[in-house]
Amino acid sequence: MKIKLFTAKKFWLSISILLFTLPNFAQLRLPKLVSDGMILQRDVKLNIWGWAKSNEAITIDFKGKTYHTVANAAGEWKIILPEQKAGGPFEMQVKSGKEKITLHDILIGDVWFASGQSNMELPMRRVAPIYENEIKTSECTFIRQFFVPQRYNFKQPENDLPNGKWISADPETVLDFSAVAYFFARNIYEKYKIPVGIINASLGGSPIQSWMSEEALKEFPSYYQEAQRFKNDDLIREIEQKDNERINGWYSDLRKHDEGFQKDLPWFLPHIDTSDWPTMTIPGYWSDTYPDIQNGSVWFRKKVEIPSRLAGKPAKLILGRIVDADSVYLNGKFVGTTSYQYPPRRYEVPANLLREGENEIVVRVISNMGKGGFVPDKLYALIIDNDTIDLSGEWKMKQGAKMQPLAGQTFVRWEPVGLHNAMVAPVTPYRIKGFLWYQGEANADKPYEYRLLLPKLIENWRVEWNQGELPFLFVQLPNYGPPVSEPSESNWAVLRESQLMTLKKVPKTGMAVAIDLGEWNDIHPLRKKD
């Protein structure tokens, strides 16, 4: 009897699991963009679309009116709503048979599709040190962002996003907003007092061809052929497996051979004998001082005196930017780590770690491409309350392990078409006001080609959204790179010219000139509001 009971339980459990895991295309479903808190584009006809049972009747109730359609044989449906004036909040009900979805807190205003690479992706938290007041005063339910998940698909355009939601700006949530897009939205809102929505589809390091459709890239045979190549899942797995094995092996060997971890007293501990350690002036690159030291790990340490009035207080340890990766210790305690060169190093020092008198900072730096060190003209300091202790100057240093250069990896997600299919295509039915674009750094190695690629991207997107010549606003690349005393060749200058030519050639485009907003030593300048 017990056996029969157990078998019955297993049977019903199996049935339950099967029913739960069956595809839900037969159920009423909306795309992730059409959800609570969405901002709809004013003054244009609106697409509301989704999925249901095949041939099922669909109704939408919105602002006192009802709209009808019938799902096709595949269960797809779309209802076109008439033009709406700015306002809200509103509710919308979508019904199919006995199923009903109610959407809350809908606003109507202007919606902008913001895309590009890292300078568009760069969130407000990265620029927080110079915009503290703007963050404190950011609360505004009429400014919202929808962050598109960062994914790729080389085989076909997708029709929905895996997740995502509309988020209103406030001092906490705004930290994850694109800084460029947020300040743009804030400016529009303050001028016109209408809701502003940002659909943020951006990814650091991405070249322009990754955002273009397969059809558009037929005019660029090398990119089109590359897109075909990456339809092969086995190829992607092989590339990623080999890259991962090689990279993991390099870092494993580095750790294994690092003298700083071989001793009874690891080098991150205080009171290590450093009598044979040479010195180096920080900031700077160690190969400029010690040409024989290139790739691998190098340990740095510096002693600082803390007065009794500051002892035990929390602090901020600011270490500018470091190439490539670093791990930081204070008085033998781990404080933080950063795995690649671009983010600013801002580490929180907890209370009770700093002591009166002598304190010691240790930084283990990893260089994998031959130019490791501390980027010049950045702040290196320990900040406690209103006191700033300068950390530039002489540091003790010693190489932990010498390594061969680590060859670069293939970033599959940057290959042609992939981001378009997964991050652009699902958004194209959603009505928008226009496009915001900050990109070009990743194409600077072929700057003349950009004067063909950028106009084609604009044409490509305008065709796909099917809203006519939607405004396309973009940022011209800012100044970047070491100052030179004589005129010289510059790919960035040529790419800026390509951007200018696009402005002159393509109607309804706008270009923000940012030549005075860059930082020579940082590809991610902070001044995103200006």
Located regions from the model:
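An acidic-aromatic loop/edge-strand motif
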Residues: 101-168, 199-285, 358-432
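Beta-strand-rich ligand-recognition modules
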Residues: 64-87, 321, 328-381
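Short beta-strands within extracellular/lumenal beta-sheet-rich domains
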Residues: 32-36, 294-307, 345-347, 421
